[in-house]
């Protein structure tokens, strides 16, 4: 009986020992699992950090590439915009030049008519009332023609007393002069005209060969006054 009890006690002790071993094994397993989890978590963090670094590096490279592409496209846009602006300006100039050429061609054909009116005004001296009335009618037409030319941007050249300029004047005659120095214009033989600042028709002029003095200031003022009076009377100086 006592032996049986002793065996039971031994068995219980063995069971307790087994339980303790089992608990120790469980605890060791838990610790190992925890360590594994920590290692796994650390490794995962390292992997994530590396991936993040790679992603940032890739994004930086992509950003740099996009910035270069943006700069390239920007430069292309600036060049295209400048080319288009130059093209637009060139087209505008070409259109203006074409317009001036067409207007010049028409006005150049009209100028001989103006010359005829001016010659008639200078040469004809109507005496009878009927002739004077007819002359006034012609002069009325002449004034209308002059006004049309002014509206188109036509202006006359003032040449007498000016130094000869081949870009503006055409020398038909040259003669000595005591009044004007060499290469100064003595007389206007056919009026020259400008159109919008450009030469519409060169003035035909008589040029001094010298010797002589250039017009004194008093003579210049006198010629200017006489020209203004002639302009007021005949309006031909207003073209």
Curated annotation (Swiss-Prot):
Residues 43-53 have a biased composition (Basic and acidic residues). Keywords: Chaperone, Cytoplasm, Stress response. CDD domains: GrpE. One of its GO terms (biological process) is protein folding. Residues 1-54, 208-239 are annotated as: Disordered. Residues 228-239 have a biased composition (Acidic residues). Residues 19-42 have a biased composition (Polar residues). GO terms for cellular component: cytoplasm. The keyword Chaperone applies. GO terms for molecular function: adenyl-nucleotide exchange factor activity; protein homodimerization activity; protein-folding chaperone binding; unfolded protein binding. Homodimer. Participates actively in the response to hyperosmotic and heat shock by preventing the aggregation of stress-denatured proteins, in association with DnaK and GrpE. It is the nucleotide exchange factor for DnaK and may function as a thermosensor. Unfolded proteins bind initially to DnaJ; upon interaction with the DnaJ-bound protein, DnaK hydrolyzes its bound ATP, resulting in the formation of a stable complex. GrpE releases ADP from DnaK; ATP binding to DnaK triggers the release of the substrate protein, thus completing the reaction cycle. Belongs to the GrpE family. This is Protein GrpE. It comes from Prochlorococcus marinus (strain AS9601).
